[in-house]
Amino acid sequence: DAHYWLGRIYYIQKKYSEAAIALAEFNTLYPDDKRLQETTLLIAESATKFAPKEQICGILTQTRDFMTNPSTKFTKRITSLINKNNCSGE
């Protein structure tokens, strides 16, 4: 749980790189946690704040394709991020 909360705190503080690292560690340690979709979305959202522009579309499409049986909320949010970042050709 510490990695989850640390990631959330970093995200709120707009420390996006640190948030992505903490949340990715959480996902690695707890791949079956019920918050996996939430943390994966936060990682993607964080990446849009710090990743080089030429990598963002790849990150977002990989995130979309990574999730098995995504919720409607997940699908809508990741699609929104893809569209917002002009990744429609991905």
Which ranges hold each PLM region?
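Short solvent-exposed coil/turn linkers within tandem alpha-helical repeat scaffolds
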Residues: 28-36, 65-77, 87-88
